[in-house]
Structures are given as C-alpha cells and as structure tokens.
C-alpha cells in the first residue's frame, strides 16, 4: 500500500520537476535514489518487489526525460556520487552512461565496495571513450 502510494507520488513529482527545472530534477532524483535504498534496507528483502516496481517506473521517466526533453548535441548529467560532470557525445552514449549510473545507484547497498569500484570503472570507461 505504502509502496504503491510512494511510487505514484514520486512519478508525479518527477514529471513536475522535469517540466519546471532540469537541474532540480537531477538533484531530486539523487535524493530519491538514496531514500529508496534506505527504505528497502529498512523494510528487508520481503519488500524487494515493490522496490523493483519503483525503479522500473523511475527508469521509464528517465528515458522520457533524456530522449525528449534534453538537447541532443551535448548532454550533461550529474554523477550520483561525485560533483564532477561528464559530457556525453550523443544520445546513445548518454543513455549508456545514465543506465550505468542508475545501475550503480541501485546496487550500492547490496554489493561490497570492491564491486562498486568495478562498476564505477566501467561507467567511466564507457562515458569517456
């Protein structure tokens, strides 16, 4: 019940922020990633299906955001855990980078630090080549 309400509320808030302010969307999405991870950690494994439902809905909104509302020539996305910016050459590379960041955000409480380092290396390799 709470997960469904939370998912619907987040979806509408994401859409509103995308329309109003692109930069705020990036920062707000990072906060939501952190909140969802804490929520899953506190609720335990029994609520993992609600977690995947929320992330699937959010990833759909991210796809809409990147392909329809962002200019295609030079696209900037904020890193989730660093203040530096990465510059993507085209929409395909942007989508690869954003999916990598999205994947890294979802596994940060499930994998040890070494695995996160490997994921970070792969994201950097894809985004800077």
UniProtKB/Swiss-Prot annotation:
Keywords, in A-Z order: Membrane, Transmembrane, Transmembrane helix
Protein's cellular compartments: Membrane
Membrane topology: Multi-pass membrane protein
Keyword Transcription attributed: no
Record keyword Transmembrane present: yes
Transmembrane segments: 15-35, 48-68, 107-127
One GO cellular component term noted in the UniProt record for this chain: membrane
Miscellaneous remark of the record: Partially overlaps SPT6.
Name of this protein: Putative uncharacterized protein YGR114C
Organism (species): Saccharomyces cerevisiae (strain ATCC 204508 / S288c)
């Amino acid at each position: 019940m709470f997960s469904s309400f939370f998912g619907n509320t987040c979806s509408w808030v994401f859409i509103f922020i995308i329309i109003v302010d692109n930069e705020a969307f990036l920062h707000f999405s990072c906060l939501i990633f952190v909140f969802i991870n804490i929520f899953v950690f506190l609720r335990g494994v029994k609520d993992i299906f609600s977690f995947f439902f929320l992330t699937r809905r959010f990833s759909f909104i991210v796809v809409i955001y990147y392909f329809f509302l962002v200019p295609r020539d030079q696209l900037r996305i904020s890193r989730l855990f660093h203040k530096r910016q990465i510059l993507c050459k085209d929409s395909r590379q942007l989508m690869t980078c954003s999916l990598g960041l999205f994947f890294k955000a979802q596994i940060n409480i499930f994998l040890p630090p070494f695995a996160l380092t490997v994921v970070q290396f792969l994201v950097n390799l894809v985004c800077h080549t």
